[in-house]
Structure formats: C-alpha cells, structure tokens
C-alpha cells in the first residue's frame, strides 16, 4: 500500500533518490527500484535534472494547498523535495528573470494524471501572483482557474482507462505583465472526440455535460427542456447511465459537479441567457439522438417514402433550437442540392442516409457548442487595454495538457490522431532534450560521449509526409470522386508503405492474426504497436455535414446558437471551396503547436500510470517499465548526468552577472568576453563547475547559477539606488533648466503683453480730456492677468478724475444738492420710478413763501427757537405731511429734519413740537416704487413714523427723493449706513404692534389720506 505522509522539507535516504541523476548505477533495474520505493513511501514526484517524473497515486495526498505553496514559493528546484509546485515556480522565475516565454509540457498516456497536474500548476501560479490584489488581475485569475472546471464538463468523459479523461487537447497561454501578474490568457483546443456523442465503448460514458444536465438540473428546468432525469432514456447517454464521473471522491457526483460548473460559468462571465442556450442545445442533441426513421407503408421502400417515428421529438428539437418545426422535419427527411444550372432540387433520404445526417448534425452541434464555449472564455480572458509602450512587453507561460497515448480494443481515426499528437510531442522532447543538446556540445567543442536514443522522426514522417504519408493518402481518398471505400484506402496505404519498418497490415503480414484482412493496419509507435481499424476513416476525415443543417441552425432565433453557425448564411447555389479535412486541420494545428512550444523555454512533466486498473497504492512494474522505455527517461538521465544544467552566450552571461565582479563592473577591459567570464567565475571560486565553449558558457550544476543569482540579488538594491540617484539628479537638472527657460519666456512675454496693453490704453484714451463726456463711452481693453489689479486701480482713478472734471465747474452752493441726489440714486438703486431728480431741491419748504405763504413767518420763529434750544446747525428738509398714528387717526402735521433731530410739528399751533427724535436714532426709512409720497421713518427705540408729504406747490410734487437723498448724504458724512427699503407693501411697528401699509391710487381722491383697518393702513393717493 502507498504510505501517506506529509511533505517534509528534506528527504532521508529511506525515500530513495529524489533525482534519478543521483543513482549510483544507471540501469533500468535501478531506475525502477528507485521509482517503486518512492511510490511506496508516498513520494510520487522525482526529478531528472529539471524534468519532473510524476506517478498517478489514484488517491488524494496531503501534498497541496497554501502551506505547500508557501514552502516552494521563490525557492530553487534542489531546495525542496520534488513537486509540481517546484516546476511551476521554476517556469515562473525563469520567465520573470529572463523576460522569456516559458512552457510546461505535461505528457503521458491516458490516465497518468496530466489533467490533475495542470490544475495544480494553475493553482500555484494563481496563489503566488498579484500580491497587491489588483481587481483586474484577480478577475483574470478567477477565469483561469474556473475555466478548467467548465472545459472538463464539456470536453472530458469517463473511459475504461481514466474516469476523467480529456477527450480534447488543451494548450493554455497565460499572459503576464512586467511585474509577473497574470493579465490575460488564451486557450487552444485540439481535436474534440465528437464521435463520443453518438457511441461509447462498454464501461464508458458520453461527455460529462450531458449527465450533469440530467442529474443536476431542477425538475422545473428539465420539464422546460422536455427531459427526464434518467440518462438511460436517451440513446446517446444510455451506455453510461449506470456510471458516475469517478470513484476517488464521493463528491464527484454529477449533481455536485453541475452546481460547480454553473458557479464557474457565472464567475467567468457567462450570462444567464447564454447558459440557458447551452442547456437547450444539450437537450436538443439528446432528443435528436432518439429520433428514429421509418419507411411509409403507402409508398414502400422502392419509392423512398420516409417519416419520423415520433414527431413529438421533432417539435422538441425545433423548440429548443428556436427553429420552425416544419423546416426541422424537412431537413431531417431530405436534402437540397443545387444542380449545375443553379437549379435547386430536393432529394429524399433513405433510412440509412437520414440516420447518418441526424448523427452528423448531433456531432457538429456539440463540436460547435464546445468551440463556442472555448471562444467565449478566450474573449473574457483577452488582455484588456494593454499598450506595450506603456505597460511593457507581456511574457507568457504556456501549459500543455493534451490527451495521452491511447490503445483501445478497437482504435479508430480519433486514436490515430491522438497517438500522432503524442509522436509529435515525443519528437519535440527528443529534439530539445537529446538531439539538439548533443549537437550543441559538439558544435561548441565540449568533450562529450554520444548517447544512443530512439528517434521517432521516421514514425512522424510516416503520418505527415506530403503525398505519401497516411494523412496525405487519406485526403486523396476523400477528394477522389467515385466509390472510394475505407478498404481501397487501406490498399493504397499497403502499396505506399509496403517496406516501411513501422507500418504493417494483414495483407503485408498474413501470419499476424491480431489484424483482420481489409480492415486493420498497424503502426509501431514509440510507445508500442497499435492496430487501427480503417472503418470510418474516410467519413471522419471528411467530417461532412449537409448545408441544410447549417442554414437551419444559422436562421435560429436564439442568438447564441446562431453565432455558432456563421457558414449557414451561404446561399444554397453559392459555390464554396472544399474545406480542409479533419486530419489536415489537426496536422496543421500540431505543427503550429510544436513550433510554439519550441519557441519557448520548456519545462517537462512526464506522467506515469502505475497500473491499468486505476487502483491506489499499486505499481505494476512491467507496465511502468514500458512507459519509462518509450518515454526515453533512461536516456534522459544519461544525457543529464553527462551534460550541463545551463548554457548561456558569453555576452548575455556578462550582462546579467557582471556587477558581481570588480573586474567586469561596469565594463571590463579584458581581451574578450570569454576572459571576462573566466575572471568573474574565478573570483567566485566556480571555475571548476563550468566548461567554456566557442561562444557559450556551459554550467554543470544548478547550484552555481543559484550562487550567482544570490550574489546578484544582494547587489541589485545598491545598483538600483545608484541608478535612481543618477536618474533623479538628471531629471531634477532637466526640470530646473526647463523651469528657467519657462520663467524667462514668461518674463519677456509678460513684458510684451504689458507694453502692448499700455500702448492700447494710450491709443483709446487720447480723446478722454475732451468735454462734455470726458471718455464716458470708452471701452477698456481686457488686460493680461498680471495687469488686472493695476487696471482695476486705474479705472477707479479714471472715474474719480472724470467726476472731478464734471463737477469742478459746479457752484459751491449747488454741491449740497448734487451730493444729495447722488446719495438718493445710490440708496434707491433704480427701484423707484420717479424721485425728483430733474428739478431743483429747495429742502426747507416750510420756510418758503411759495409752499407756506400764510405761516412761513410762524415757522421761522419756531425754527429760531429750536436752533437756540437744541443747537442744530442746518435744516436738511422740511415739509407739510399727512400722518397716521397707532389709533388709526390721520392728522396734518409738519416734518422738520435737521442735522441733529427729526421733529414732528403741529402746524395749527404755531408749529409746536410734538416729538423730537435724535438723528442718530434714525436707522432707516421705507418708500414705495410708485409716484406717491409715502415714507415710513424707522428709529431705534421709537415708533415708526408714517407720513405722506403733501400741500406742496405744485400739488403732488415728488419730494421723496429729496428727503431720502438729504438724510442718506448726512448719514454718509457721519460714517454710518442708512437702510433704505423700496416696497409696495411696507411693514411697520407701533408700540409693539406689527402692521402693513400699502398705497391705493384713486382717481376721485382729492387729496392724499389714510384709511385703516384692524392691522393695515392704506394710503389713498389721487391718481389724476
């Protein structure tokens, strides 16, 4: 049994050798003993240098998770026991250190654990990146991790060799920014085994997605899809109805997996409508598989009459694909053909033809669905808003998880392509690890003992050779008009490859009874002999589907389904180019994949399947030995023991490590780069672990590189500070010079603008001294910002100068009136219609014989007495008024305003003083906006005085402005503000009571008078 233990930092000798390179004797027996010992001790990982050998334990081991990731993060390969995390970390560090694309190639036969290995690699990369928790990077990481779950549902199935076998090839590129955080990705898929949709071997299942839909969906959803929960009801899922996804984990039920896939699709970014469309397409495929065709009795087989046994299924398919039912039925029973004259002919199917078309449609629908899912994930993972000029060049880590070598009881076209793919990858491994390495040693003049290995190039050539290769012969058979059968194709292969050492058939080897005449051929692959049945080769290679189905599904109302069939928009009469065959497309994709991998720095994970029964803790020595042999692991160990861990051109080596040696920093003065490298290594004491080639340095041990990297890492912060200091100083000097230039330009430009502005001012104000306007209508030019305060001051000075020019000829006796009018204009602010500006102001109207002919002498006597008593200096204003008191009674009174007091006088009693209010107590007055003479005087500590100026000559003369102006001018002279309010409804206060007063014009009113109500006063004003 497999010993399950926790991963320790170091491994003792009881666990065997952690690296096969360290074996004392390099034989197959020693290799297998070490592999078996480590497997029994729970050590499923072993190195061959930097290549990781992984044995599938078929059980969960406590080797993974955040704690294990922390132990491997930032470490070198030899510092921790062998692990997938170590390989992922090495690929990630190589990418960051050298800014070079890397790839991790995971290979091995079906069931060896490749898919699980790729998951752990993705988990490690996601865990060690994005320490700053950038939202966009987190989004990309979530999509990368969750995409595996979705692709497994649609691309994996249970086989007899593997409970979760990838039935497609997957290569994922992960894009990283200059900080090493993932910013995007792209998934390439290869050769989905779509024939599995129709039929599976005994003990196998269809793709997981079908069973997850049936067993994991809610009853209401299944009812809407016209589905039953039992997979045995449907032809396409009946074979695997009694099987589960896997046996290792009880949680791996279809129901729980369906929930996980739905959550993953939500996180990735599939909309609810898109998920619903996916379920409808899966349901339509299941219903399509249950459609049976029968010949109609009335027509008979000779007339080709055909009908569907259960037309309800046609309705289900039509509803789920959002297409017309009649069109679905017609497409299933017949096909349309365009003749040479562009005439469209409808040709009815036979039962066999209709069944073939139905199956082709089901396979194509699932393939298009799978491709759409992959493209959807790619569109979401695509790097967004990446500009190499700003963000730097992106680097890439590629992860290849592709189907392993397969040998089934009956091997068809799919197994042929899968095994060809594995031959190509093995050829790449041979080229990079064995062949190119030995050739480089010879080219560089390094002493080397040649190691023999099997080169599978001849097998690859057998498959892909132009004109004569198996794929070329198959394409020729597909393109030839006439009754070309699989048997004729086999005969052609026998003719072309009769003498090929890796090809055989029953015709060429009649004694080999493992093959049937006219059906089988055999290829001696690097992994073993595989017999292929040619039945279905031509049909699967053509991969044909009637155009009627493409047009039908393209015209679907469902936008998701419609997007999967862009080729359906072609008209039936349109002549199209023959599409490339499935084999050619796969070959081209493999060539492109190998070229892509060859352009990157590779890291290898070689997966081994311990036994055929998928039993935990059991290692079948013979089965594992066979895998070790065909994977070339022993040869890999030999090359590694005799070879070097790293090689670098001298200039590149110096560029990276020259700062660690005083003779090479910053630039060496030695004869050549090779001499400089030698001096650098001698200073570190590492010259014994290297070999000098013609143009490259070869380093034997990874520890040498680690030593140099550690020295470099210690010096980098010092160099960075030095560079930062120099660069910041340069930037500061550049900035200072730029500022000086800016200020010089600003200074001269400012002078220019000031000079131009002053010249313009001088030009405009040349005629400002000419009377009578003195420049009143001149427009001031807009000044530069720097001159705005200066111009504001100039405008004030100009206004004062102009005012001086206007008033200097006015007699001194009129200046009091002028100042009062100016004060009135400012106080009223244009809110009153007429305020007597155009007439002369007499001010003291009670002393005037014109206004007060009968009592002017009496007022003069009273005025003299008041002047002697109160000591005021001048009379500001006097007039007869009509006043209203708090008792709502109106009386004739006189108003006298002096420079010290405001007097209310009684004209009927020789102008006796009724009230005297100190002028400093007067805080404001209120007037209306009309021509009436109402005024309310407000004084602090006194009732408001409500009066109407009247008994003037001429009658109703407008004297409100005169009162306002004289009082406002006097207050200005004393340095205080008089509040003047203009309102048609004036509030007032008398003995604490609040009232309102307004004006009502009346034509019949002979003289102004007051009318009162409970809380209001109204001035009745003659309007004639």
Swiss-Prot record:
Gene inactivation effect: T-cells display impaired migration patterns and are less efficient in scanning and evaluating antigen-presenting cells. T-cells show global reduction in membrane tension, while their homeostatic tissue distribution and responsiveness to T-cell receptor (TCR) engagement are unaffected. However, T-cells move faster and straighter, leading to defects in detection of antigen-presenting cells, specifically for detection of rare antigens.
Binding annotation for ATP: 108-115
Effect ascribed to mutating residue 111 to R: Does not affect localization to the plasma membrane
Biological process (GO), any one: phagocytosis
Chief location category: membrane
Occurrences of domain TH1 (ranges): 830-1023
CDD domains associated with the record: MYSc_Myo1 (cd01378)
Keyword Acetylation found: no
GO molecular function, one term: calmodulin binding
Tissues where the protein occurs: Specifically expressed in hematopoietic cells. Detected in adult tissues of the immune system such as thymus, lymph nodes and spleen, but not in brain, lung, heart, liver, small intestine, testis and kidney (at protein level). Highly expressed in T-lymphocytes; constitutes the most highly expressed class I myosin in naive CD4 and CD8 T-cells. Also present in B-lymphocytes.
Span list, region Actin-binding: 590-612
Keywords: Actin-binding, Adaptive immunity, ATP-binding, Calmodulin-binding, Cell membrane, Cell projection, Immunity, Lipid-binding, Membrane, Motor protein, Myosin, Nucleotide-binding
Family: Belongs to the TRAFAC class myosin-kinesin ATPase superfamily. Myosin family.
Reported function: Unconventional myosin required during immune response for detection of rare antigen-presenting cells by regulating T-cell migration. Unconventional myosins are actin-based motor molecules with ATPase activity and serve in intracellular movements. Acts as a regulator of T-cell migration by generating membrane tension, enforcing cell-intrinsic meandering search, thereby enhancing detection of rare antigens during lymph-node surveillance, enabling pathogen eradication. Also required in B-cells, where it regulates different membrane/cytoskeleton-dependent processes.
Quaternary structure, from the entry: Interacts with calmodulin; via its IQ motifs.
PANTHER family associated with the record: MYOSIN, UNCONVENTIONAL MYOSIN-IG
Domain notes per entry: The myosin tail domain mediates binding to phosphatidylinositol-3,4-bisphosphate (PtdIns(3,4)P2), phosphatidylinositol-4,5-bisphosphate (PtdIns(4,5)P2) and phosphatidylinositol-3,4,5-trisphosphate (PtdIns(3,4,5)P3) and binds to membranous compartments. It is required for recruitment to Fc-gamma receptor (Fc-gamma-R) phagocytic cups.
Record's protein name: Unconventional myosin-Ig
Record organism: Mus musculus (Mouse)
Taxonomic lineage of the native organism: Eukaryota, Metazoa, Chordata, Craniata, Vertebrata
């Amino acid at each position: 049994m497999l010993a399950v233990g926790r991963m320790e930092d170091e491994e003792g000798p009881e666990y065997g050798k952690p690296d096969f390179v360290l074996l004392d004797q390099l034989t197959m027996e020693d290799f297998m003993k070490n592999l078996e010992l480590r497997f029994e001790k729970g050590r499923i990982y072993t190195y061959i240098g930097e290549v990781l050998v992984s044995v599938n334990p078929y059980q969960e081991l406590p080797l993974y998770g955040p704690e294990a990731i922390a132990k491997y993060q930032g470490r070198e390969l030899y510092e921790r026991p062998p692990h997938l995390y170590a390989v992922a970390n090495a690929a990630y560090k190589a990418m960051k250190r050298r800014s070079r694309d890397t790839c991790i190639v995971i290979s091995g036969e079906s069931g060896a654990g490749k898919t699980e290995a790729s998951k752990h690699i993705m988990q490690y990369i996601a865990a060690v990146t994005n320490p700053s928790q950038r939202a966009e990077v987190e989004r990309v990481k979530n999509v990368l991790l969750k995409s595996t779950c979705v692709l497994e549902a649609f691309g994996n199935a249970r086989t007899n060799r593997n409970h979760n076998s990838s039935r497609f090839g997957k290569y994922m590129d992960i894009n990283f920014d200059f900080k090493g955080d993932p910013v995007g990705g792209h998934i390439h898929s290869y050769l989905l085994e779509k024939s599995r949709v129709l039929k599976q071997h005994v003990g196998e299942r269809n793709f997981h997605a079908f069973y997850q839909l049936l067993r994991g969906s809610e009853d209401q959803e299944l009812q809407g899809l016209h589905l039953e929960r039992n997979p045995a009801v449907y032809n396409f899922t009946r074979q695997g109805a009694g099987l589960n996804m896997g046996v290792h984990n009880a949680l791996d039920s279809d129901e729980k997996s369906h929930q996980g896939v739905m959550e993953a699709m939500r996180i990735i970014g599939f909309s609810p409508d898109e998920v619903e469309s996916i379920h409808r397409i899966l349901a339509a495929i299941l219903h399509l598989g249950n459609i049976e065709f029968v010949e109609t009795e009335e027509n008979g087989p000779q007339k080709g009459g055909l009908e569907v046994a259960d037309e309800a299924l046609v309705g289900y398919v039509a509803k789920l694909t959002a297409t017309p039912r009649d069109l679905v039925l017609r497409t299933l029973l017949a096909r349309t053909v365009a003749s040479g004259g562009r005439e469209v002919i409808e040709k009815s199917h036979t039962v066999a033809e209709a069944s073939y078309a139905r199956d082709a449609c089901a396979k194509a629908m699932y393939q298009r669905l799978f491709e759409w899912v992959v493209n959807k994930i790619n569109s979401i993972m695509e790097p967004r808003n990446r500009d190499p000029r700003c963000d730097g060049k992106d680097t890439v880590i590629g992860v290849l998880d592709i189907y392993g070598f397969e040998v089934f009881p009956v091997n068809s076209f799919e197994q042929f392509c899968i095994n060809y793919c594995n031959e190509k990858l093995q050829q790449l491994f041979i080229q990079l690890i064995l062949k190119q390495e030995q050739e480089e040693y010879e080219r560089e003049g390094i002493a080397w003992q040649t190691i023999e290995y099997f080169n599978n190039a001849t097998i690859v050539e057998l498959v892909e050779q132009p004109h004569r290769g198996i794929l070329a012969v198959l394409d020729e058979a597909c393109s030839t008009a006439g009754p070309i059968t699989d048997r004729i194709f086999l005969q052609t292969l026998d003719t072309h490859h009769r003498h090929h050492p890796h090809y055989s058939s029953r015709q060429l080897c009649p004694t080999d009874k493992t093959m049937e005449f006219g059906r089988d051929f055999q290829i001696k692959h690097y992994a073993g002999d595989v017999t292929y049945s040619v039945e279905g080769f031509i049909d699967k290679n053509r991969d044909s589907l009637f155009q009627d189905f493409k047009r039908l599904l393209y015209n679907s109302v469902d936008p998701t389904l419609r997007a999967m069939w862009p080729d359906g928009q072609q008209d039936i009469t349109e002549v199209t180019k023959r599409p490339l065959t499935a084999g050619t497309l796969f070959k081209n994709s493999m060539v492109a994949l190998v070229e892509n991998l060859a352009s990157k720095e590779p890291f290898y994970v070689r997966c081994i399947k311990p036994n055929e029964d998928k039993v935990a803790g059991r290692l079948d020595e013979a089965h594992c030995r066979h895998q070790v042999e065909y994977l070339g692991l022993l040869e890999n160990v030999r090359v590694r023991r005799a070879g070097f861990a790293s090689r670098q051109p001298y200039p590149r080596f110096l560029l990276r490590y020259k700062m660690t040696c005083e003779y090479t920093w910053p630039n060496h003065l030695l004869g050549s780069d090779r001499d400089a490298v030698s001096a650098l290594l001698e200073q570190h004491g590492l010259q014994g672990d290297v070999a000098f080639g013609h143009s490259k340095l070869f380093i034997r041990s990874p520890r040498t590189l680690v030593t140099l990297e550690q020295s470099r890492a210690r010096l980098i912060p010092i160099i960075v500070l030095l560079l930062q200091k120099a660069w910041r100083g340069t930037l500061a000097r550049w900035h200072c010079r730029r500022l000086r230039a800016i200020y010089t330009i600003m200074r001269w430009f400012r002078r220019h603008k000031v000079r131009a502005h002053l010249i313009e001012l001088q030009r405009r104000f040349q005629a400002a001294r000419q009377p009578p306007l003195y420049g009143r209508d001149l427009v001031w030019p807009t000044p530069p910002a720097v001159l705005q305060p200066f111009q504001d001051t100039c405008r004030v000075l100009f206004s004062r100068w102009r005012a001086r020019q206007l008033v200097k000829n006015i007699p001194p006796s009129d200046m009091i009136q002028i100042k009062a009018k100016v004060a009135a204009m400012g106080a009223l602010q244009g809110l009153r219609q007429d305020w007597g500006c155009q007439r002369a102001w007499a001010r003291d109207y009670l002393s005037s014989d014109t206004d007060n002919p009968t009592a002017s002498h009496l007022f003069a006597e009273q005025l003299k007495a008041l002047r002697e008593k109160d000591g005021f200096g001048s009379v500001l204003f006097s007039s007869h008024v009509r006043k209203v008191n708090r008792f709502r009674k109106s009386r004739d009174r006189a108003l006298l305003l002096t420079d010290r007091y405001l007097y209310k006088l009684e004209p009927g009693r020789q102008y006796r003083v009724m009230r005297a209010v100190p002028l400093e107590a007067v805080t404001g007055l209120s007037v209306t906006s009309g021509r009436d003479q109402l005024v309310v005087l407000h004084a602090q500590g006194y009732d408001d005085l409500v009066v109407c100026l009247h008994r003037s000559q001429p009658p109703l003369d407008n004297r409100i402005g005169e009162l306002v102006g004289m009082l406002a001018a006097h207050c200005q002279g004393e340095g205080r503000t008089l509040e003047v309010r203009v309102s048609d409804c004036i509030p007032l206060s008398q003995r604490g009571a609040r009232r309102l007063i307004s004006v009502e014009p009346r034509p019949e009113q002979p003289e102004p008078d007051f009318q009162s109500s409970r809380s209001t006063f109204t001035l009745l004003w003659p309007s004639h």
